[in-house]
Amino acid sequence: MPWLEALPYICGWLILRSCLLVGAQLDSDGTITIEEQIVLVMKAKMQCELNITAQFQEGEGNCFPEWDGLICWPRGTAGKTSAMPCPSYVYDFNHKGVAFRHCTPNGTWDFIHGSNKTWANYSDCFLQPDINIGKQEFFENLYILYTVGYSISFGSLAVAILIIGYFRRLHCTRNYIHLHLFVSFMLRAXSIFVKDRVAQAHLGVEALQSLVMQGDLQNFIGGPSVDKSQYVGCKIAVVMFIYFLATNYYWILVEGLYLHNLIFVSFFSDTKYLWGFILIGWGFPAVFVVAWAVARATLADTRCWELSAGDRWIYXXPILAAIGLNFILFLNTVRVLATKIWETNAVGHDMRKQYRKLAKSTLVLVLVFGVHYIVFICQPHSFSGLWWEIRMHCELFFNSFQGFFVSIVYCYCNGEVQAEVKKTWTRWNLSIDWKKAPPCGGHRYGSVLTTVTHSTSSQSQMGPSTRLVLISSKPAKTACRQIDSHVTLPGYVWSSSEQDCQPQSTPEETKKGHGRQEDDSPVGESSRPVAFTIDTEGCKGESHPI
């Protein structure tokens, strides 16, 4: 088909586009931590100091250039107001606004005598309260979304692990790989919960505004460093979060490699490659995460290690490589499925049915291979607008609920798992029935439960409500009469309910007026053949002479 021939070019274009967006993805987030904000301000401060040195040598003016903690102010003219755009490196500022500062006629900047600081008007840089409230509600909704999603995924994956681990018939290499994938999803969810608890996720605009208005940001940046030991737990939480995030991506890659090898590799020995898959899933992510932690502790040991500091590519680049490789495996697998469908269509199959089959298979593969990751990577990266909000909701929805979808595909909708659960359920019901005390007149011979009631013999093979009735040729009006010959049969098990089910002696009634006497002979001595009827109401069967 034409589009199959163009598939390699499409794949190459997507990979190229992904590579072009890698730089924007590595050091950008939907939000920014307070540590990241501080680093950006410190970089601007160092650049400002270089500019101030050059201005002292070249320029002239009354008010000296200086760094006030947020903006690098140039030389000011006496008696005039200087304006500078709101700094773009402050995340929660209105980047279209302008900050003002006044140079007095005596050649000094306006001074706040109470706080011993220069004055600047940043009111235009602050976001409007309604916009701030809207952003806060937006992030709260995102938090609720991914918290619910990861919680549901965690619970469903835990049940799936118990089911596969309980049944020995399900213990095989394929399911072992599934179990490792389930565990990686659970660890990813738990690490996110822990990280949210011990690390500050976002920089609130109110916190930044209070620092600026009180003049504390400059002191906070240039002040002495605090005790780093108090951030040990926070650093461990961040490192474990990054490691479990990376292992989850690589176990998704392992699933793709395993499926791809089953399709394309002849005589593929899954047992032989199991330890190799384990090394890829758990070992390789540990290498680059440890390398990142060492680089971070050596070069930029600040706070909780949530900021990029230019070293995020150490772990982000291998993760993006795993996503890209998995996407290539997905395209190749879909190509093979489509080829098989057209081959079977040539034999005379229904084309619509084949397309539906391809669509179902592709949908399952999208969940298994994590194709949504490459889709979100290829989207333009921005932090505002309706499209960004839609993208954030979709991305967090698929990321958090992917574990739930994977558990459905690999466990709950698996035919082998369903068969084992049904067999266990049937055995459990049979064991419950066997432990129950037999009814009145019931006795067990080996594994068969037999009940003798009003001319009725019940066997377990006949069903719960069916009675096989032996009836004498003559009508009987006596009560339930029990034959005790069963005691001598082999395999007899005495029932505790026999004492309550002993037959009561019933006097024989003789009807002299009609000249007939009730027949007290045993059933086996009847002079006429017996008839078998099905009694569905216990001892209410009627006799019909043949």
UniProtKB/Swiss-Prot annotation:
Record keywords: Cell membrane, G-protein coupled receptor, Glycoprotein, Membrane, Receptor, Signal, Transducer, Transmembrane, Transmembrane helix
Region of interest (Disordered), residue spans: 496-546
Primary location class: membrane
Keyword Transmembrane helix among UniProt keywords: yes
Stretches that traverse the bilayer: 144-167, 175-194, 236-258, 274-295, 314-334, 362-380, 392-414
Biased composition (Basic and acidic residues): 508-519, 537-546
PROSITE patterns: G_PROTEIN_RECEP_F2_1 (PS00649), G_PROTEIN_RECEP_F2_2 (PS00650), G_PROTEIN_RECEP_F2_3 (PS50227), G_PROTEIN_RECEP_F2_4 (PS50261)
Stretches in topological domain Cytoplasmic: 168-174, 259-273, 335-361, 415-546
Pfam hit, one: HRM
GO biological process: adenylate cyclase-modulating G protein-coupled receptor signaling pathway; cell surface receptor signaling pathway; positive regulation of cold-induced thermogenesis
Annotated Gene Ontology cellular component terms: plasma membrane
InterPro entries assigned: GPCR_2, GPCR_2-like_7TM, GPCR_2_extracell_dom_sf, GPCR_2_extracellular_dom, GPCR_2_secretin-like, GPCR_2_secretin-like_CS
Molecular function via GO: G protein-coupled peptide receptor activity; parathyroid hormone receptor activity; peptide hormone binding
Extracellular side: 27-143, 195-235, 296-313, 381-391
Subcellular location: Cell membrane
Signal peptide stretch: 1-24
Compositionally skewed regions (Polar residues) per UniProt: 496-507
UniProt note on tissues of expression: Abundantly expressed in brain, arterial and cardiac endothelium. Found as well in sperm, in the head of the epididymis. Lower expression is found in vascular smooth muscle, exocrine pancreas, testis and placenta.
Topology within the bilayer: Multi-pass membrane protein
Glycosylation sites: N51, N106, N116, N121
Quaternary structure, from the entry: Binds to TIPF39/TIP39.
Family listed: Belongs to the G-protein coupled receptor 2 family.
The protein's role, per its UniProt record: This is a specific receptor for parathyroid hormone. The activity of this receptor is mediated by G proteins which activate adenylyl cyclase. PTH2R may be responsible for PTH effects in a number of physiological systems. It may play a significant role in pancreatic function. PTH2R presence in neurons indicates that it may function as a neurotransmitter receptor.
Protein name: Parathyroid hormone 2 receptor
UniProt source species: Rattus norvegicus (Rat)
Lineage: Eukaryota, Metazoa, Chordata, Craniata, Vertebrata
